[in-house]
Amino acid sequence: MGLLGRLFGRTSNNGDRAHAWRESWARAVEARDAAALAGLEAALRQTPPLADDLEIEEEMLDALRQLLDLERDLAAARLPLVDTTHRVVGADRCHFSAPVSMPDDPAQPTGRLLLTSSRAVFAGGSRTPAVPWHATREVLQRDRDLLFVRAGADEGYRFRCNSFADALCGAAIARHLMRSARKGLTHTPDS
């Protein structure tokens, strides 16, 4: 570590602690572990702090809270309903809508990712890629990115969300809709 780092109290230990916190957060997300919230919150409040600015970590913690709330609703077969008149939704029910970009597209268009009862669809840019749930092999989430992989393909569509909450909740809803389509369900009860 350099002289400036030592003078201003920056140590490699802070970087290690921040990395360890993010790994703990990722495990809590994967396990849907509500009990981990208190420990993650306490770790953010330690002195010295994990980082000079904890805004991203606080956003990640809030995203985990939102995901846990959503998972309770999904377990009870309650999907969120989003009122929209967007033409790409058509007669489908819309269960998620978030601003996204497509970082792998050369034009890097921005628009909205809409998760409907029958498909994931991007509204923005010059084209409107859509992936029907029955043709979706996998939904992956990493940081603020969502990747929808089509059945029979090695590639997919990557969407970059503006927040961790949108990425986590969008992935959870997409997986729920994908599983429902595989079971042959066209609509999940909205009670």
Predicted feature descriptions by range:
Residues 104-125:
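Conserved beta-hairpin
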Residues 2-110:
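Anionic N-terminal interaction surfaces
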Residues 3-11, 88, 125-191:
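Acidic, Ser/Thr- and proline-rich intrinsically disordered linker/docking segments
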